[in-house]
């Protein structure tokens, strides 16, 4: 019997285009629609030996893994995944592997949102196409404005470099950030999270999700921001209190927000984030680029080959 491989959340239908799966002695079955319910997942994946999953969209708790008797290998894009129960996988003889992931696409996505907000691109384009007013917004200048970064890691530091190229004043804060590290990137270390929020014209989130960062930006923090300031989150949804952000947008306490990550993905129809005012929202596109997908799926093929040869690579955790 040939092995079967499920490729989850292949929304664009490109998984089999960007990598050569033909060299595998495996039947590859892409799933175009997201499966949220655990019972539905158990039913859909019950006769698969291998599952390829994107990011952290589909949790694999022990309760699901135990219901997949044929499952032997999970390949997750990226080298960090907090929604897979590794102990349960080990107990059931399931190997878990990851892939490389480029920091370039999320940096570019961050700037797409910042520029879109600053120049009212979506609003002006929609007005032009729909016969609306000719020029209805007044763009926010980037040159001379302050960009505040929550997090100065691999992605945050590259976002900072672009901000500096635009002539922005760039500040950064995280609990572990030192003045020396900030200076090495060419940015200022903010005195505190509160100071960064209060004095920045654009605030962009670039932190890993953990217990200390979960809910880091809530109603009190949003209240510190200028009414002319914008918040951008391309990192992890749970870092920003979504309800508090919705309230801030509705109350006009901030000028707007750019959001690429959500508490529930894909967003259900009728979800308030789909219709919030002054929100530039995108369906988690930060990692979605042809180059990144070629890496994800190309290395997924390599991982499957290595596993079948008895020498797994890029094992997690």
What name fits each language-model region?
Residues 1-97, 218, 224:
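An N-terminal-biased, well-structured beta-alpha scaffold segment characteristic
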Residues 10, 152-153:
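Glycine-rich Rossmann-fold phosphate-binding loop(s) that bind the pyrophosphate
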Residues 26, 94, 187-188, 278-279:
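Short, conserved active-site loop motifs that form the nucleotide-linked donor/cofactor pocket
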Residues 43-46, 56-64, 176-272:
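Rossmann-like adenosine-cofactor binding region
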Residues 50-53, 76, 204-205, 233, ...:
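Redox-cofactor binding/interface segments in oxidoreductases and associated redox assembly factors
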Residues 92-94, 98-146, 150, 161, ...:
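Phosphate-binding beta-alpha-beta segment of Rossmann-like dinucleotide-binding domains, i.e.
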Residues 96, 228-317:
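Rossmann-like dinucleotide-binding domain for NAD(H)/NADP(H)
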Residues 156-157:
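N-terminal Rossmann-fold NAD(P) dinucleotide-binding loop
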């Amino acid at each position: 019997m040939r092995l079967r491989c499920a490729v989850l959340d292949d929304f664009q239908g490109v998984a089999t285009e960007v990598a050569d799966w033909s060299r595998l002695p495996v039947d590859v079955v892409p799933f175009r629609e997201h499966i949220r319910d655990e019972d539905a997942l158990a039913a859909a994946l019950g006769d698969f030996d291998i599952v390829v999953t994107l990011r952290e969209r589909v949790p694999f708790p022990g309760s699901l893994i135990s219901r997949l008797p044929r499952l032997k290998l999970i390949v997750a894009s990226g080298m960090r995944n907090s929604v897979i129960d590794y102990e349960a996988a080990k107990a059931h003889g399931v190997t878990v592997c990851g892939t490389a992931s480029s920091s370039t696409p999320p940096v570019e996505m961050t700037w797409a949102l910042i520029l879109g907000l600053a120049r009212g691109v979506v609003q002006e384009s929609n007005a032009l196409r729909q016969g609306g007013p000719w020029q209805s917004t007044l763009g926010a200048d980037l040159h001379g404005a302050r960009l505040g970064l929550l997090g100065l890691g691999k992605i945050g530091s590259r976002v900072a470099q672009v901000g500096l190229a635009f002539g922005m004043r760039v500040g950064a804060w995280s609990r572990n950030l030192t003045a020396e590290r900030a200076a090495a990137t060419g940015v200022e270390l903010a005195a505190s999270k509160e100071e960064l929020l209060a004095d920045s014209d654009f605030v962009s989130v670039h932190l890993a999700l953990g217990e200390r960062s979960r809910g880091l930006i809530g109603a009190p923090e949003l209240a510190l921001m200028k009414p002319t300031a914008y918040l951008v989150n391309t990192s992890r949804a749970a870092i920003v209190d979504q309800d508090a952000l919705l309230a801030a947008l509705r109350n006009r306490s901030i000028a707007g927000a750019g959001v690429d990550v959500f508490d529930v993905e894909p967003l259900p129809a009728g979800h308030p984030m789909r219709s919030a005012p002054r929100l530039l929202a995108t369906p988690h596109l930060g990692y979605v680029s042809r180059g990144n997908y070629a890496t994800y799926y190309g290395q997924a093929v390599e991982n499957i080959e290595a596993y079948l040869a008895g020498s797994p690579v890029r094992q997690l955790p």
